[in-house]
Amino acid sequence: MAAVVDDKDRVLGVESFHTTRHGYRLMLAWMRSFGDLQRVGIECSGSYGAGLLRYMQAAGIEVLEVTAPDMHDRRRRGKNDHFDAESAAHAAFAERHTATPRSRDGMVESLRVLRVCRKTVVQARRIALQIIQATIVCAPDRLRDPLRQMTRMQLIRTLAAWRPDFTAYREVEDAYRISLKSLARRYLELHDEIADLDDMIEAIVKDLAPELLEQRAIGLNSGAQLLLTAGDNPERLKSEASFAALCGVSPVPASSGKTVRHRLNRGGDRAANSAIHIIAIGRLRLDPRTQGYVAKRIAAGNSKLEAIRSLKRYIAREVFGIIIRRQKQINQSQIAA
């Protein structure tokens, strides 16, 4: 559903289109039939609106992501697709409740897709292991006893190497053997798949920001998550303060009277916040400079949690600087090519 407003924010038309390339082409032609097209506002540009976002950007149209509906208008008029399209058009015209969307045409998008795939494979492997353990608990003693003292991978490889009689599946013990062998082979296949995905993810992270992995306590998973949060176009963030707010580590004032303090920021990308927290805890254990900083903040009257929140803010600043510098290098190399 799409709506068009004029330069006085009056609705000129509302129309429905299919979410296909042909539908996008018809939508763009319909919008341009009203005159010069200034900008387009899209809801859910990271999911259902991703295809439309890519099409509009390829056509050279300025695109804004509409981040939140007009709740006052929704309470007054209710909700349907017609009203939502009008609300998005009004938001794009006024440039309120909008943001520059992440472009989804670079290596960061490849990284995101691979990490989503890896997450589901890890979940499937964990489920397979849980079923193996539950099955062994219920297995006959003659099967269970030799497996008790084995480590996880010893157990999995032992079960995968079993050669049960597949024609005797009606017998209880043989049915257990068949089931455990099948589950163990599944676990090993998923384990190998995770290793392959990790190699691809590591290669992309090293291409995008090799300096990031050289920093203390920044591992592959944390670095990948921070690259995902920044996106393929980190320049859309106006400053490192914007990146800190996006990661949920910007200070939120919670002062009263003569007490000046800041509280936990519960907003932003919680996955990025978790990655920065892991980095902060790692540095607190390994980095003498970080240990000295936290000790200094505690001596000044801050709690340990408040000191860690300040540390997370500095980490966000450091990470953003690395990502932006690398992005400039990539852009310059593309221009030179």
Enumerate the predicted regions with their spans.
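A detector of single, family-specific signature residues
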Residues: 1-337
